[in-house]
Swiss-Prot record:
It holds the Pfam family Baculo_VP39. GO terms for cellular component: viral capsid. Keywords: Capsid protein, Late protein, Virion. Expressed late in infection. It is found in: Virion. GO terms for molecular function: structural molecule activity. InterPro entries: Baculo_VP39. This is Major capsid protein. Belongs to the baculoviridae p39 family.
Amino acid sequence: MALVSPGVSSRRSTNHCIFGAIEPFDSCVTYRSPCSSDASVDDGWFICDYHLKLRFKMSKMVLPIYDEDDNQYKRTIARHLVGHKERGVKRILVPTRANYMTVFNLPGMMLAEQLIFHLIYDNRLEVNRICASLKNNENFIDNTYSVVESVYSATRNILSLTDPQAYCSRVANDDVRFFDANVVDNNYQAGNGDTVFNNMPGFLRNLIRRAVAPETLQIDSEDLRLRNCNTCVINNTGLVATVTNTELYNPVRSSDIIKTRPNRLQIRNVLKFEGDTRALERTLGRYEEYPMYVPLFLGYQLVNLQNDILRANNFLPAPFGVPQAVNNLEAQAPAAPAPAAPAPAPAAPVV
C-alpha cells in the first residue's frame, strides 16, 4: 500500500521545518532558508525556532512538571515576543483564514513563502493564482518548475504529518484540550474559542497545542493548577497574546528580534536601567533568577494514562474512556468528511 500521495516525496526529511524548502522561483537568485539548528530535530513542532520567531512571534520553551521524587514530565510551551505596548493586529500570533494575508503581510514576501502560507491555510484559489503567474514565465519548464515542485513537495510532506485525516497522522490526539470552555453541571462545554480552534488547519492546531500550555492539567484523576489566569486568548481573529485590562510587561530582547532588513531605520522606545548595580549583583547573584517573560497559558488539558506510563510523546492514539466533556466539544465542532476507505491504525509502542 502506498502511504504517500502522488506528487509528494517519500524520502526521509532531514529538515522538519515547514519553511525549510524555501527557494526563490527566480533561478538567478541564490537563497536558502535560514533555519535554526533545531530544524534537524523531530520535536513535533514542524517549524524551527527561527521561523517561529519571525512569522508567529513566539519562541520555543520546555515546561518541566516535577513530581514528589523530582522526576520530570516535560511538555512543550512557547513564550510570545509581543511587547506590552503593542496593540491591534500586532498582538495576533496565529491568525485565522479570514485575516492571515493581512496579519502576515503576504504581499511583502517572496512567492515561495506566499505559496507555503497558502498551502498551510488550504487557500487553493491563491495557490492556483501563483501557479498561473509562474506559468507565464518563458523559463517555467526549464528552470522554475523543478524549484516549485521541490517547495510544494516538501511542504505537503510536513502538512501530511499534521493532517488528522491522514493515515498514520502524527498530530497530538491522545489528550483533551479546551481553550474557551465553561463548566456546566461538572462538564466542560466548548466555547467560541474552541470552535475557532477546531476550524483551523491541522498544522496550526498542532502548533497551538505545542505552544499553549493549559492553566489546569489533569493527569488521570490528578488536577495540577499550573496558572490561575490565562496569558492569551483564542477569538475570531486567532490566537492573540492579550489579557484583560493592562497587558503583561514583556520586554522583547534584542536577541529575539529577527532583523530581516538591516538597512531599514527602526526606532524603538525601551526601558533601560542605569547606575551601579554591582552591589545588588554580588548580593543576589547566588539565587535562582525568575524569568521575566510571558509564556502562553490557556484553558484545560486532560492527559490519559496507558499501561500506567505517562506519555511525554503525544503521538500515540488515545485509548478510550473520554470524559463527557469531549462529547460536548465534538458536538459543537464541524463534522469532518469521512474517508473513503479508512485503514486501521497500526499499533505504536509506548514511549
